[in-house]
């Protein structure tokens, strides 16, 4: 678990909640409690202790430069201990955030220099049978339509992740 004050920039996808619910029904330990379905644009982001107004302005500006998008989630991805659903339509915004803050290594470098845009469904699925069960349950829910409407900067507090601010995609009105 990361330390309090860790931040992330994400796109929350409320319509994808059933994917996490399916994994939770198989094993609640596989789903991070209190973390909604989302695509991480940059994690970890600038630590809260050194986060500046300029960083926040840059997040808002970059979010405004991308339109809101209707998404079709179709493909389950599995790696050892990990089940996700790919979201290739959001790769350009993920890449833009990585480019804007090129000194930050996504996921601390654990998944390479350019991790694919995805919704994490289950983490810690080290038992291959459990991972297969999650993959099958999630696969039955796809395809799933959702909409990316805003970017959110979140901060880890002692009691879990909390939003710091939300910036609409496509400008002030989210168009």
Locate predicted features.
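Short, exposed beta-strand-loop hairpins at the edges of beta-sheets
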Residues: 153-157
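A short, structured active-site edge motif that brings together acidic residues
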Residues: 73-77
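Short strand-connecting beta-turns/loops that link adjacent beta-strands
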Residues: 78, 158-159
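Basic, often amphipathic N-terminal segments
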Residues: 1-70, 87-149, 161-175
